[in-house]
Amino acid sequence: MAKSGSFNTSKKTQDYGDLYLTFAWSIKSQDIASNKTVINWSLKGAGTTGDYYYKAGNFKVVINGVTVYSSSTRIELYAGTTVASGTATIAHATDGTKTFKASAEAGIYNTAVNCTGSGSWALDAIPRHGTVSHSLKSKTETTAVINWSSDSTVDYLWYSKDNGSTWTGVNVADGKS
């Protein structure tokens, strides 16, 4: 599964090279409780060399269906110049999986949009169920000692000594045995 990604927009060819933009992202954090991933993203100028720059405007960045940046202002772009950057929060499906799409566009040497690009990535699934393991340590005719452990997604462990008629909860929010 992807932890980062990037794409280049289509190119505008000039005498001194192809001009385009590069969109890049990387995971900042994942939150199990909220079932969401936060990514860092950036949009940068690319394709020029040395002191060359180009005018570009009508920028737009869409991440997971949400417009995170939009500007009609025309600016001078050198290779590596950051047009915009930020974070975006992406909600996962109820089973913890998520594939998201990002797109970017701009007008390079044009007022109208003439360079576009997009990409799609599958994020690491966020666990939506806890894992508990157990084993019998010892037993007698009247007692049994059970070893158990849980992962960090488990808050409470419930057990029954009467075949499910009543249950006892143990706070295991620290995920320890």
Q: Residue spans of the language-model regions?
A:
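Short beta-strand segments within Ig-like beta-sandwich modules, predominantly Fibronectin type-III
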Residues: 168-175
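Asp-box/BNR beta-propeller loop motif
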Residues: 163-167
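Proline-enriched interdomain boundary motifs that mark the N-terminal boundary
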Residues: 127-136
